[in-house]
Curated annotation (Swiss-Prot):
Organism annotation: Methanosarcina acetivorans (strain ATCC 35395 / DSM 2834 / JCM 12185 / C2A)
Keywords of the record: Ribonucleoprotein, Ribosomal protein, RNA-binding, rRNA-binding
Residue ranges with Basic residues bias: 82-94
Protein family (similarity comment): Belongs to the universal ribosomal protein uL4 family.
PANTHER family: 60S RIBOSOMAL PROTEIN L4 (PTHR19431)
Gene Ontology MF terms in the entry: RNA binding; rRNA binding; structural constituent of ribosome
Gene Ontology CC annotation, any one: cytosolic large ribosomal subunit
UniProt region (Disordered), positions on chain: 78-107
Superkingdom, taxonomy of origin: Archaea
Chain intervals with Basic and acidic residues compositional bias: 95-107
Self-association state and partner proteins as the record states: Part of the 50S ribosomal subunit.
Role played: One of the primary rRNA binding proteins, this protein initially binds near the 5'-end of the 23S rRNA. It is important during the early stages of 50S assembly. It makes multiple contacts with different domains of the 23S rRNA in the assembled 50S subunit and ribosome.
GO biological process, one term: translation
Name of the protein described by the UniProt record: Large ribosomal subunit protein uL4
Length: 253
């Protein structure tokens, strides 16, 4: 069974911990992508136009004999209305609010995707390909004292000592305005993901680190493929606590 060094809050190695079998899972980018896309699809809200959008007009057709197309026209005007190719008219085939856009993933596939994404966090090549900046040896396992940190300043000091804070700064200054119409729809900026911190239990670290740019903090029970592989790309820079490593034993089987 593979082992990993354990670091304290100053970034120094203080021991070793045996890694559970989940870290030996095969890399399956196809299953990871399938699980992440399903999670994103299942968050979608129903959307579509109002039932009478583009139809609320008194337009009517002129009929034959005028040498013009047979389209509804506004009263006392020759301007076309209501039809899809007219300004302000209805859409031809709009999205239907009643459509089922959810996606299903087999339970065994979903669990295997999580195991594969967990194993990918130990591969320096995959982590580097995601753009993460780090100096520490992977996987990064911290002592349980990390879970008791209550202030964001303390978390920053730990990340600096572990050689991970540069990645947080990369996410902080990497925010940029998105291209396209999404700017008008409540998603003006695109944000980068940085460090994922996984704790064993619901401890103070979950609140202390959550306001750092790009940082996500979760318990083992809340892990999913999207947290481990944002945008379907596996190899997220992840910090595990000793208790989290212990809870991974036999998990997601």
């Amino acid at each position: 069974m593979a082992t990993a060094k354990t670091i304290d809050l100053t970034g120094k190695a203080v021991g070793e911990v045996e890694l559970p079998a989940v870290f030996d899972a095969d890399y399956r980018p196809d299953l990871i992508k399938k699980a992440v896309l399903a999670a994103q699809a299942n968050r979608l809200q129903p959307y579509g136009p109002r039932l009478y959008s583009g139809m609320e007009t008194s337009a009517r057709g002129w009929g034959s004999g005028r040498g013009v197309s047979h389209v509804p026209r506004l009263v006392n005007s020759s301007r076309a209305a209501r039809v899809p190719h007219a300004k302000g008219g209805r859409r031809a085939h709009p999205p239907k609010p009643e459509a089922d856009r959810s996606e299903k993933v087999n339970t065994k596939e979903r669990r295997y995707a999580i195991r594969s994404a967990i194993a990918a966090t130990t591969d320096p090549t995959l982590v580097s390909l995601r753009g993460h900046i780090f100096e520490a040896e992977l996987p990064i396992v911290a002592v349980n004292d990390l879970e008791s940190l209550e202030r964001t300043k303390q978390v920053i000091e730990f990340l600096e000592a572990a050689g991970l804070y540069e990645d947080v700064l990369r996410a902080k200054y990497g925010r940029h305005i998105r291209a396209g119409r999404g700017k008008l729809r409540g998603r003006k900026y695109k944000h980068k993901k940085s460090v994922l911190i996984v704790a064993g239990e619901n401890t103070p670290i979950l609140k202390a680190a959550r306001n750092l740019s790009g940082v996500d903090v979760v318990t083992v029970d809340s892990l999913n493929a999207e947290l481990l592989a944002p945008g379907t790309h596996a190899g997220r820079l992840t910090v595990w606590t000793e208790s989290a490593i212990g809870k991974l034993e036999g998990a997601f089987q």
